[in-house]
Amino acid sequence: MKTDRHKKILEVIDRYEVGTQEELAKILNDEGYNVTQATVSRDIRELNLSKVSVDGKRTRYATLTKDKPVASDKFLTVLKEGFVSMDMAQNILVIKTAPGMAMAVCAAIDALEWNEIVGSIAGDDTIMCAVRTVNDTLLVMNKIKKLIKNN
């Protein structure tokens, strides 16, 4: 339940300009999650969400990363071109790639040096990433989606 709620929170803050815990709680309640402001507050802390300025006057919740930028545009291209889909099983992230692309995509992910990823192995078209926690797995999935969408 908590994992689903965290996933929904990440989707909501990516889609809407949510500026307060009350706004987020209302959206989650409208989506069928029975949450209080206190629950939302804990979730925000656990997901390491931050408030960022929208226009100098308003703020919104966002995921911020202090990770290093991607080493090369080539890695981004490989990640974008080779990526097919991803799914999670607890703290294991499974990434499907185009046939023969898993090792290259895995190298691109390793080059990101994200602290949440403990390690990864690649086959022909599948990558398995061991991630520190379930919440970190959701964050990594969100980061990968943003990289693919923004490039």
From Swiss-Prot:
Q: In which broad location class does this protein mainly occur, judging by the first location in its UniProt entry?
A: cytoplasm
An example Gene Ontology biological process: regulation of arginine biosynthetic process
Function of the molecule: Regulates arginine biosynthesis genes.
Its domain of life? Bacteria
State the Gene Ontology terms under molecular function. arginine binding; DNA binding; DNA-binding transcription factor activity
Would you tell me the protein name for this molecule? Arginine repressor
Name the keywords, alphabetized: Amino-acid biosynthesis, Arginine biosynthesis, Cytoplasm, DNA-binding, Repressor, Transcription, Transcription regulation
Q: Which NCBIfam families match?
A: argR_whole
Against SUPFAM superfamilies, the record matches this protein to: C-terminal domain of arginine repressor, Winged helix' DNA-binding domain
Q: Which InterPro entries match?
A: Arg_repress (IPR001669), Arg_repress_C (IPR020899), Arg_repress_C_sf (IPR036251), Arg_repress_DNA-bd (IPR020900), WH-like_DNA-bd_sf (IPR036388), WH_DNA-bd_sf (IPR036390)
What's the family?
A: Belongs to the ArgR family.
Q: Where does this protein act, in terms of pathway?
A: Amino-acid biosynthesis; L-arginine biosynthesis [regulation]
Write down the PANTHER family for this protein, in alphabetical order.
ARGININE REPRESSOR (PTHR34471:SF1)
Subcellular location per UniProt equals: Cytoplasm
The answer to whether keyword Repressor applies is yes
Query: Which Pfam family, any one, appears in the UniProt record?
Result: Arg_repressor
| Annotated Gene Ontology cellular component terms | cytoplasm
| Transcription regulation as UniProt keyword | yes
